[in-house]
């Protein structure tokens, strides 16, 4: 275990694994623990290696016995006995490095040792476990890939159907293209008008904001003037109490004060008028906004009514088409009814005439049928005679085939005997040649001895 990179299993585990996973049928039944311990049997080990190669590489056992040489070779039996062992050895040398076994030799096939065979078989078992796990994982990946492909195909189909539906919904039929163009132009005009009105409303709102700022400034100025007037009145009352002036100066001061009061009143009146104008403008702006909102609502109602009228027009057109088709069908049905009535009267006349003709034809046919039955009886008798002849021919052919089969079997037996005789002759000739060679060698040796003796 310290040298190997794989676990060495027990003999019972190895036997059970190879019986269930590698071998099949009678081979799995006959493969036991005695084939590996105490001394492994070379035939069973070689057969097991062949089955492993068949499982992994689809290399059947009969393929090992094919001799890759020309037909005209001397003693092909020697090659036939040696070819499968060398083929298994070459294939195992190529395969076992994958299982982390690098020192496989011919002695492991011809004269296997227990410890060595157990390590090799446990290495192969470890690789087969790994292979099984990888196959399960790849099968799971393939199933998931197939499911994903099915989903993708379903999604592509749904996408194509959705695209077709979108095309149907977006494309306007030629009958409604003129109406659609008119509606589009009307909508464009409405949108331009609404934009202009929105611009006017925004301009009015800006003016209203300016007026509001002006009103605020004027109100501030008014408050300041009122404060100034109050301060001036206080100062005047103080000055009156402190200073006693001349009547002329008082008159002048009073006139000045009156002029200033008049000016203040005039400015106040102007400010009030301006305020009233601005309030009127604000009211007008609010009225304009309300009117614009009403217009927008009317436009929306108009669009909804246009769509409803369009739907109703389509329904009316479809109903008109249905009405026309029904009227046409009614006309065709009425004409067909008249034609059928005429045809019925004609048919009744024809049937009465045909009934008489049929009766006459029936009498003629009955006579013909009687004649045909007589001919059929004669033909049936002839047919039975022919069937008997065919059965006799079939019996003769069957007997002939049986004779042919017996002759073929006899020929095969004779050819087998001839082949056996030929093989015996070959073996005897080989033995005879060997004996002659031995005799020649012995005679040569005797001659040499005689020469040396003389």
Swiss-Prot record:
Has the keyword Nucleus been applied to this entry?
Answer: yes
- Name the Pfam families for this protein: Nuf2
Q: What is this protein called?
A: Kinetochore protein Nuf2
Main localization category = nucleus
Q: Which domain of life is it from?
A: Eukaryota
A GO biological process held by the record: cell division
Q: Which residues form a coiled coil?
A: 143-347, 375-439
Alphabetical UniProt keywords: Cell cycle, Cell division, Centromere, Chromosome, Coiled coil, Kinetochore, Mitosis, Nucleus
**What function does this protein fulfil?**
Acts as a component of the essential kinetochore-associated NDC80 complex, which is required for chromosome segregation and spindle checkpoint activity.
GO MF terms listed in the record are: microtubule binding; protein-containing complex binding
Where it sits in the cell: the answer is: Nucleus; Chromosome, Centromere, Kinetochore
Q: Which GO terms describe its cellular component?
A: Ndc80 complex; nucleus
Assembly state and interactors?
Component of the NDC80 complex, which is composed of ndc80, cdca1, spbc24 and spbc25.
What the record says about family reads:
Belongs to the NUF2 family.
The keyword Kinase is assigned to this record: no
